[in-house]
Amino acid sequence: MTVNLKNFLNPKVKMSKMGEFQELQPIEGLEISAVSADLYGDGRDDLALFYFREGANFAGVYTTSKVTSASINWNLKIRRNFVKALMVNTQNANTFTGIKGAQGLKEIAQALSKSLTLKSSQSPKGVSEVVKITDLLFASTGVIGEDFPHLKIKNRIPELVKKLKTEQNK
């Protein structure tokens, strides 16, 4: 594998800093997508979705800090160890955002639940399954204390779900 140092050091380059990467084999039952919600302001991907068609067992290890993000608080309320999807956003940690951050995350969860349920209903197998908001996990990383851009994220959910695929390479 080669790394193009000119691209690696140039923040304006939108292509991968790693250059060519080995082909990743599909993981059975997992679909992945990534899109830009323009959280960085430069068009690069900043949202990722991992969708487990049959569901997946999970365990979480979270911070012991008393300061937690809305995403961590959401995940801690999931009382079972089974999920259907994990959505990750960058650029905003959704921490110190108060009730607005929590409400924004709930709106995202409702929109994601609806889109994944619709995707499930269009399955070639003809099996329709409701994806509940309690089937969803969230992770946010980035700046602390800024308003959570939930509308930018929510508006990209249909495209994020549409782009789900088993091949992880773009």
Spell out what each predicted region is.
Residues T2-K119, V130-K170:
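Alpha/propeptide regions of enzymes that mature by internal proteolysis
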